Swiss-Prot record:
Disruption phenotype: Mice display the glaucoma-relevant mutant 4 (Grm4) phenotype, with angle-closure glaucoma and eyes having short axial length. High intraocular pressure (IOP) in mutant eyes increases with age and the anterior chambers become enlarged in some eyes at around 3 months of age. Eye's angles are not occluded with abnormal tissue (synechia) and have detectable trabecular meshwork and Schlemm's canal (2 important drainage structures). However, compromised aqueous humor drainage (outflow) contributes to the IOP elevation.
Origin organism lineage: Eukaryota, Metazoa, Chordata, Craniata, Vertebrata
A GO BP entry: proteolysis
Name of the protein in its database record: Serine protease 56
Keyword match Glycoprotein: yes
Length: 604
């Protein structure tokens, strides 16, 4: 741990001790430490509220999607999940009206031209912990195609979001959570062979929004060498330089396989890679452009753009004799169609699906058979026994997802999102690592930043002081499938009512006091403590374990935040009942009554 960190923590930990017969028995955390703990608790509350809002928004989008299907032309309605899209979207590859369908011939991503607003409606930005890492291409309402190497060491979907394209009039881009990440099973991180990944969005893209999908190739044919194609992204303006704040575009010619092999050597695999650019250099993609599109125009009455390559790697940026390398999309078209059309029983449910599934062991949720069907594929028993087995395995996996999500969430809050983006060896066309933030109380020694999880929302529930406003439900008459979605919406609203109804001005957690028993040290160096905290007008007291050394305190903070959330949840569930001054009778007996706003330890 850095010396500056130790000094900071030692200053914050100036103890307020109480003694008996000259020997300290109890100590209080300093006001500075309580202030930092309160700030982290407030961040946890804010993240939980955002997650709850996203969960409701996603179901509302599903309801709108179902209504759109019901109101469309009469056609058989598939029983596939709502997040599943046909592999070939309608009106793909078309730019918005008023936006020219040409890319500047002399533009450069490395130091060059800014693309007009809305010129790349299929271009998206993949964000890890809220920080941009790679580009991507929208290929269907719920699917983004990108480079597999973007997820090296960070393949948990809970960490990722996708920023969609802005509109032609500068409309604000929409941020969407990621439901599933599917790297190609044969991706080789050493050679970048098969460098392709599909990302399933948690919320389908609205057909009325500014984002539009690109067209996928219809067959195995590619444009001939010399064809001018287009690239775009937010990548670095020069090698190892800063990223661009706006989308930049360039037009580059496709090069023949022989030329690519000659200039790039054995690192190029012509079977799955193609290259494009100028042998004289100067125009190329760069760090941060990974996963972005290489598109070529398809002539016709209504010209459209077709995706033929995904930005993969390169030796430098815009250097002479070193064109950029792109993964061939035509080679993987069958795999893409298979993944995007797969039914729910063919793959394990994602953590995000399970964390938003309000199942109970004694009262299974109505969509359990579809969500858990994957686990019943090889069951040889009766239908009912297989359903029970699938539900049990679903619940077990959800518990693991909850533990991972909660633990890594709080660790991520304590370290800060920027810690997720340390140097990542092996990325040839990856994003340059941002500078580390200054050391703070959130530092956790020995923890691998790639294993962190951002806050995805704890399953806290209850009520706030306000009466919940009923959601207006769309008309369900004559549209099958809406009633289960409305039931799902109501269940999510009940589960998250407490956090959803906290007014913004009250969304702050305050730790008033942490009183540690110096005679209760555990083998891990933690001490039993009693914590007094507040949220708005609510006051709770609960027990926990706290460290009094810099390193042990940092490790004990996540658990304290979890216990605080649980305590406020319990308090909200018992609202209206006579409130005891303590959470738990044993704590009240040990501590006695509250006097003058402080926890008073018993003195022998």
């Amino acid at each position: 741990m850095p010396l500056a960190m130790l000094l900071l923590l030692l200053l914050l930990l100036s103890p307020d001790s109480q003694t008996a017969h000259g020997h300290p028995l109890y100590t209080r955390l300093s006001p500075g430490a309580l202030q930092v703990l309160s700030a982290q608790g407030t961040q946890a509350l804010q993240a939980a509220q955002r997650s709850a809002q996203w969960a409701i928004k996603r179901v509302l989008m599903e309801i709108q999607h179902r209504l759109h299907e019901c109101q469309g032309p009469g056609r058989p309605r598939p029983q596939a999940p709502l997040l599943q899209d046909p592999p070939e979207p309608v009106q793909c590859g078309e730019r918005h009206q008023g936006v020219a369908n040409t890319t500047r011939a002399h533009g450069r991503i490395v130091g060059g031209s800014t693309a007009p607003s809305g010129a790349w409606p299929w271009l998206v930005r993949l964000q890890l912990g809220g920080l941009p890492l790679c580009g991507g291409v929208l290929v269907a309402a719920s699917w983004v195609l990108t480079a597999a190497h973007c997820f090296a060491g960070a393949s948990n979907e809970l960490l990722w979001t996708v920023m969609l394209a802005e509109g032609p009039q500068g409309e604000q881009a929409e941020e969407v959570q990621v439901n599933r990440i599917l790297p190609h099973p044969k991706f080789d991180p050493q050679t970048f062979h098969n460098d392709l990944a599909l990302v399933q969005l948690w919320t389908p893209v609205s057909p009325e929004g500014p984002a539009r999908p690109i067209c996928l190739p219809q067959g195995s044919r590619e444009p001939p060498a010399g064809t001018p194609c287009a690239i775009a992204g937010w990548g670095a303006l020069f090698e190892d330089g800063p990223e661009s704040e706006a989308v930049r575009e360039a037009r580059v010619p496709l090069l023949s396989a022989d030329t690519c092999q000659k200039v790039l050597g054995p690192g190029l695999r012509p079977s799955t890679m193609l290259c494009a650019g100028y042998l004289a250099g100067g125009i190329d993609s760069c760090q941060g452009d990974s996963g972005g599109p290489l598109t070529c125009s398809e002539p016709g009455p209504r010209p459209r753009e077709v995706l033929f390559g995904v930005t993969s790697w390169g030796d430098g940026c815009g250097e002479p004799g070193k064109p950029g390398v792109y993964t061939r999309v035509t080679v993987f078209k069958d795999w893409l169609q298979e993944q995007m059309s797969a039914g729910p029983s063919t793959r394990e449910p994602s953590c995000r699906e399970l964390l938003n599934w309000n199942a109970r062991e004694e009262e299974p949720f109505t969509d359990a058979p579809g969500l858990c069907a994957f686990y019943a594929r090889q069951c040889l028993g009766s239908e009912s026994s297989c359903a029970r087995l699938a539900l049990q395995q679903c619940l077990q996996r959800r518990r693991r997802c909850e533990l991972r999500s909660l633990a890594h969430t709080l660790l991520g809050l304590l370290r800060g999102a920027q810690e997720l983006l340390g140097p990542r060896p092996g990325l040839r066309r990856g994003v340059s690592a941002p500078a580390r933030s200054a050391p703070s109380l959130q530092e956790l020694p020995g923890h691998n930043p790639r294993e962190q999880r951002l806050y995805s929302g704890s399953r806290i529930a209850g009520t706030w002081l306000q009466k919940p406003k009923p959601e207006r439900r769309p008309e369900t008459k004559g549209c099958p499938g809406l009633e289960p979605l409305q039931q799902k919406l109501a269940a999510i609203q009940r589960a998250h009512a407490w956090i959803l109804q906290i007014p913004a001005e009250h969304l702050a957690m305050n730790f008033h006091e942490v009183l540690a028993d110096l005679g209760s040290k555990t083998l891990t160096g933690l001490f039993r403590a009693w914590v007094r905290a507040g949220l708005g007008d609510q006051r709770v007291v609960f027990s926990g374990l706290v460290g009094l050394e810099p390193s042990t305190l940092a490790h004990s903070l996540p658990r304290l935040l979890v216990q605080a959330l649980k305590a406020f949840r319990s308090a909200s569930l018992t609202e209206g009942e006579p409130q005891a001054p303590w959470i738990g009778a044993d704590q009240g007996q040990r501590l006695g009554k509250e006097r003058q706003g402080q926890l008073q330890p018993p003195v022998p």
